[in-house]
């Protein structure tokens, strides 16, 4: 028994010695690695140059530069979440560039590469049931020269979301009118929005709105069934510090999603929407803030800056159906613009009604990678006899990494009714090719 005990003890001692030797070897290896790292750091320091006098002449010597500590960023306030993001869109535009938008003849655009959007944004949430967004665009016109770009605010708003069915949003953002206008720039299927959308929708405005989803609390599984928006805005565009008069723009939208679920095993949904707008505007107000509406003498279009005061009302309806790889989107918009007398000054333009529509179809040829797009659009500006513009579009979208990295190409053919009826003013059909690279971060 004693011999066995001595044997066990010796075996344990030998095992302990082996473990110590192994650990010692590991420590020696770590020390060697640390020495090598230190040597490499000394061998490749960061230097600045400095001119010094050595008693005879001035010479340039290298002076070691201490490494800076890593950058540390922390929010000043008590936000629960703070997110920095942005995106870049670069266009190549050739042929009759932007002819679909009425840019031909006296408003023609030359072939170009274009920094379409370069935006950076900051979003956040507070524990007190507020969220916010601040976004600016480095690719906007600076208002001094249309050929230059400068930084300009796009979205600056705060939203109180204590009650999902009744939220309050204040600041500058897109007024709730028009499906295509409200669809983010980074996810629409065509490179540019349609002419009817640009001509009629109010785009970004400064104001306040009440909005919400009434079924969020009582029917959570169907919270998207109904969404409503009701807003009051200055009505004279974004980044303007004054209202054009003592009147306001009133905008409302209803969205209904009666179906969201699989059809024959394919992801599917149906969304319906309707909008309404009413506004009284002063002379000089641009009523086509994101597109062209005014018909020029040669049938081309330009932004509509009111020559005198007006009263206008607009409405639209839209639908979006998705079935597996296929999407079908359509929208119809209409606006009535009537001159009004203010302080004894009679209107200097004739009343008119403008309307238009677009229908867009999209299909993934390769799921989530390659998408084919077609679109038919029409705008009747309603200011001259037979002044409508038609366009048909065909395109491809290649999703390198979803919408984060995307390539797009569109071919657009446009017809001008006005120029067809008045051939002396120039050609009535136009062709253009648009390309886009998009990066989101």
Roles of regions detected by a PLM:
Residues 2-89, 96-101, 220-225, 441:
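N-terminal periplasmic/intermembrane-space "pro-region" immediately following the signal or transit peptide
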Residues 6, 14, 28-30, 135, ...:
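Acidic-residue sensor for enzyme active/binding pockets
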Residues 69-278, 321, 353-382, 387-392, ...:
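Outer membrane beta-barrel
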Residues 107, 144-146, 157-161, 172, ...:
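Outer-membrane beta-barrel pore domains
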